C-alpha cells in the first residue's frame, strides 16, 4: 500500500516520471524507509537509490504547506533535503531542495545509458526543483564534479580518456530546455569553459545539443600529439588568448565536436 501510494504521488507531480520500490517500511520518528528505489522518465531509468528515509515535519500539517525531510544513499555517496508541498488543491505548487555529497555518477544510469561516452566522477552540489499547478517543472542547480574522467569509445588524438581535477557548473531547467549557464573545468590535459542549451527529447538520448566554449590544452598534452598536429594548434593558441573556441552539436548519444 505504501509503495502504491508513493508511485501515485510521483505521477501526480509529473506523469512523465515513475518510481519503482523494492521495499518500504515505516520508521520512528514517524516516517518511511524505502530501499532499492528506481526513478524513471518514461521507460528510461534515471537514478537508482540504495535507501531513502522520508519524514514529515508534524507541525507543518497545521499549516498551508506540508514539509518533508529526507536523507538517502546512492552511488556510494549521500543526499539530503526538504520537500515543500502546498495543501491547497487549487495551488498544486511544490518545491524540493536537495544537497548532493560525493555521488559517483558512474553508478547513475541517467549519466551512462544515453551516450557513447562513459563519465565518472564524484558529484556534489545543490539542486532546487519547482513544480507549478500545471505539469511544468523548473529547476536550478549549482554542481561540482571532482576527480572526473570522460572515456571515449575510440581514441581521440591518441587519448582513451580525459581526466579533470574538477568541473563546476550552474544549470537551469525550464520545461524541455536545459541551459548550462556557466561551466568551467580544470583537467590534466586541458582547461576550459562551456555553456549553451540542451533541448530534452524522448527518448532522452535524442536530446539535441547546442553547446559552445573554449579549451586551453596543456603544453605537455600538445607535445604528445606529435609535431604535425602541434604545429597546427600552436598558431591558433597564440592568437586566441582564452583558448580555442569549439562547438558541440548533435545529440546526447552522438555528440559532434568541432573547432
Label for each model-derived stretch:
Residues 1-81:
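Terminal hydrophobic membrane-targeting helix
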Residues 22, 44-59, 136, 140-177, ...:
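Beta-propeller and related beta-repeat scaffolds in trafficking/envelope systems
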Residues 35-39, 100-106, 144-150, 216:
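Generic short beta-strand segments
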Residues 43-54, 73-82, 110-129, 158-169, ...:
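Amphipathic hydrophobic-ligand
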Residues 54, 65-68, 77, 105-110, ...:
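Acidic, Ser/Thr- and Pro/Gly-rich intrinsically disordered regions
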Residues 66-67, 120, 136-139, 198:
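Short "repeat-start/strand-capping" segments in structured domains, especially the N-termini
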Residues 68, 94-96, 139-141, 211:
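Transmembrane beta-strands of outer-membrane beta-barrel proteins
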Residues 71-75, 143-149, 184-188, 214-218:
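Short, solvent-exposed aromatic-acidic interface loops
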